[in-house]
UniProtKB/Swiss-Prot annotation:
Protein encoded by which gene: OPG001
Induction section of the entry: Expressed in the early phase of the viral replicative cycle.
Keyword Lyase: no
Pfam families per UniProt: Orthopox_35kD
Name of the protein in question: Chemokine-binding protein
Organism of derivation: Monkeypox virus
Family: Belongs to the orthopoxvirus OPG001 family.
């Protein structure tokens, strides 16, 4: 169940999101009981009408991995590392956190007026990115434990876009109907600049269809109201307009 709290100009959303993915590649492993797991996150943000026009996408991308250390008596218990990706562009500062999830290898953006589209995804085997195969048991554990957070704030960054010249790479997932599962831990949205937010997340095997290894979820925040209805991620954004940020 998703919950949200509006505080001043901030909307805090505790969301749950599942995701499903699948893809094929000549470099997929042929080993039995091995799977190339991936994640695909699609975000559509509609900015407030009064937000100053800024179409400079991909101004900067940073990646930071943090591990929480909890001291218990004389022992130090290390928590699972969380990797944060911060994307600045088009008047927004978007921070995504991933814990025990498939690796993000592709980040892209597009902007059209007050609409900003962003995509973060794994990259399927055979496209020059590392995509290690894991066992079925490890894949099921990843689906169960993967947790994601989103924090979208306003940005006044004025630097030029840093768009890469290579094509946007992706996970080549199936986007078929699959079961839902909680993946999103929390979402923070600064309503000073964000009017609406829609996003979809999928996790699954990138090389073969397997309903047991694919999950998805979606979330909407529209005109001040949060909705648990998952967005149809196949039509959420026009992927052909995305430009590579990394």
């Amino acid at each position: 169940m998703k919950q949200y709290i509006v505080l001043a100009c901030m909307c805090l959303v505790a969301a749950a999101m599942p995701t499903s993915l699948q893809q094929s590649s000549s470099s997929c492993t042929e080993e039995e009981n091995k799977h190339h797991m991936g994640i695909d996150v699609i975000i559509k943000v509609t900015k407030q009408d009064q937000t100053p026009t800024n179409d400079k996408i991909c101004q900067s991308v940073t990646e930071v991995t943090e591990t929480e250390d909890d001291e218990v008596s004389e022992e130090v218990v290390k928590g699972d590392p969380t990797t944060y990706y911060t994307i600045v562009g088009a008047g927004l500062n978007m921070n995504f956190g991933f814990t025990k999830c498939p690796k993000i290898s592709s980040i892209s953006e597009s902007s059209d007026g007050n609409t900003v589209n962003t995509r973060l995804s794994s990259v399927s085997p055979g496209q020059g990115k590392d995509s290690p195969a894991i066992t079925r048991e490890e894949a099921l554990a990843m689906i169960k434990d993967c947790e994601m957070s989103i924090d979208i704030r306003c940005s006044e960054e004025e630097k030029d876009s840093d768009i890469k010249t290579h094509p946007v790479l992706g996970s080549n997932i199936s986007h078929k109907k699959v079961s839902y599962k909680d993946i999103i831990g929390s979402t923070i949205v600064d309503t000073k600049c964000v009017k609406n937010l829609e996003f979809s997340v999928r996790i699954g095997d990138m090389c073969e269809e397997s309903s047991e290894l694919e999950v998805k979820d979606g979330f909407k925040y529209v005109d001040g109201s949060a909705s648990e209805g998952a967005t149809d991620d196949t039509s959420l954004i026009d992927s052909t307009k995305l430009k590579a940020c990394v």
